[in-house]
Amino acid sequence: MAKKGGFPGMGGVNMNNMMKQVQKMQKQMEETQAQLEQKVLETSAGGGAVSIKITGKKEIVGISIKPEVVDPDDVEMLEDLIMAAMNEAIRAADDMMSSEMGKITGKMNMPGLF
């Protein structure tokens, strides 16, 4: 049976307070995720030869290729530039999401839980 103020072995953590914190954090995370999904990041490769625009939802919303890098005799180079720019865009979207979510989860103070 639980003692007043917490559960045995959990350092006096009050489950009601902990649940309120978790619910608040979950709401903040949902709001932040919705905001980040609307943000557009732009990354590039080859010194700006290929640029990619990506949302926080990891949807590609734009690709720009400078005409001077389009060489019919070297399609492989263009493919490599596009791949590098897309990979960088995905990393940037992941980093943005992780960073913002970390700000929320880092604020959670639940002594004795971890």
UniProtKB/Swiss-Prot annotation:
Disulfide bond found in the keyword field: no
Keyword Mitochondrion: no
NCBIfam families registered for this protein in UniProt: DNA_YbaB_EbfC
Descriptive protein name: Nucleoid-associated protein Clos_2855
SUPFAM superfamilies: YbaB-like
Record Gene3D superfamilies: Nucleoid-associated protein YbaB-like domain
Family recorded in the similarity comment: Belongs to the YbaB/EbfC family.
Sorted UniProt keywords: Cytoplasm, DNA-binding
Function per UniProt: Binds to DNA and alters its conformation. May be involved in regulation of gene expression, nucleoid organization and DNA protection.
